[in-house]
Regions:
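Glycine-enriched, solvent-exposed interface loops adjoining structured elements
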Residues: 1-206
Length: 206
């Protein structure tokens, strides 16, 4: 079975369920599966870079922001900012009387990036982050997860049919297949980022 579009995904889910009374629920199953994929998947295809000028304590994150990978100030030599908790950032502000300076720390506060010290000028910053997985719809018919890992999409949706399939033995199988798919996605990303299998040939010298 080939699954490359939103419509084909819905059709495959319907075939697996084999329940005419659940056809209207399939889009909901897909949406719930997408929410789970967002929590479980961290892949290099999600990685993005955003550059901005920071001159205030708070900066907005990109619209598709999911999670920080790295955050740097690139003005006057590139320097990474250290991620700390909101509590620790507040404590540092209190101990330093909220003094301004070159930003060295950041926290995610109310959906924004909060830096400390508060910038004493305008600095260029680069944010490397994981972007959200785009939702499928009748107009947005595919995304990178469906293109490269359709099995994960399929089983994530099938899992969420559970309330309608009481004591159906297939649910355990679908859950296991979903987890196996997630493991493969994340392992694929890790393998690419470390440069292959990690195996190296040892040459003997004479």
């Amino acid at each position: 079975v080939t699954i490359t579009t939103y419509a084909e995904l819905q059709s495959s889910i319907a075939d697996f369920l084999n329940r005419d009374d659940l056809t209207a629920e399939i889009k909901t199953f897909i949406a719930l599966g997408e929410a789970e994929l967002r929590r479980d998947v961290r892949h290099w295809r999600q990685e993005k870079r955003s550059t901005a000028e920071i001159d205030t304590q708070y900066s907005a994150v990109p619209a598709d922001f999911l999670e920080v990978i790295r955050f740097y100030v690139t003005s006057n030599n590139t320097r990474p900012l250290e991620l700390i908790s909101q509590y620790e950032l507040l404590d540092r502000k209190a101990r330093n009387l909220n003094a301004g300076g070159f930003p060295a720390y950041y926290a995610i506060t109310a959906g924004e990036i909060e830096v400390f010290p508060v910038p004493d000028g305008t600095y260029t910053a680069e944010l490397y982050y994981y972007a959200d997985i785009p939702s499928l719809s009748d107009s947005a018919t595919s995304n990178w997860v469906l293109q490269y890992h359709p099995d994960a999409y399929l089983y994530s949706a099938l899992k969420h049919s559970a309330p309608f399939l009481v004591e159906d033995q297939r649910l355990t199988v679908w859950a296991a297949l979903y987890q196996a798919g997630i493991d493969r996605i994340n392992e694929d990303s890790a393998r690419v980022k470390v440069g292959g299998s990690g195996l190296r040939m040892k040459l003997r010298s004479y």
